[in-house]
């Protein structure tokens, strides 16, 4: 059986936490920021934990992470 390959796009976007969850940067922070309130932009800073329903797919994409 050949080695499994890491999905490079996913590897750049997601990090695994010590408990096995995945975290990623929040969306909607790149452009069209003028109409977004300061509160909304502040809350979008940092990272978000990926939903548990999406975790099995990420484990497939990132087998060695």
From Swiss-Prot:
GO CC annotation terms, alphabetical: cytosolic large ribosomal subunit
One Pfam family linked to the record: Ribosomal_L35p
Gene3D superfamilies, sorted: 4.10.410.60
Membrane-crossing segments per the record: none
An annotated GO BP: translation
A GO term, aspect molecular function: structural constituent of ribosome
InterPro entries attached to this UniProt entry: Ribosomal_bL35, Ribosomal_bL35-like, Ribosomal_bL35_CS, Ribosomal_bL35_sf
Family: Belongs to the bacterial ribosomal protein bL35 family.
Protein name per Swiss-Prot or TrEMBL: Large ribosomal subunit protein bL35
Protein source organism: Heliobacterium modesticaldum (strain ATCC 51547 / Ice1)
Gene that this polypeptide is encoded by: rpmI
């Amino acid at each position: 059986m050949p080695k499994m390959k890491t999905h490079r796009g996913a590897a750049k976007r997601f990090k695994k936490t010590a408990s096995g969850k995945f975290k990623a940067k929040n969306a909607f922070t790149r452009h069209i920021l003028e109409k977004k309130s300061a509160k909304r932009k502040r809350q979008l800073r940092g990272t978000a934990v990926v939903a548990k329903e999406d975790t099995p797919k990420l484990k497939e994409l990132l087998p060695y992470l």
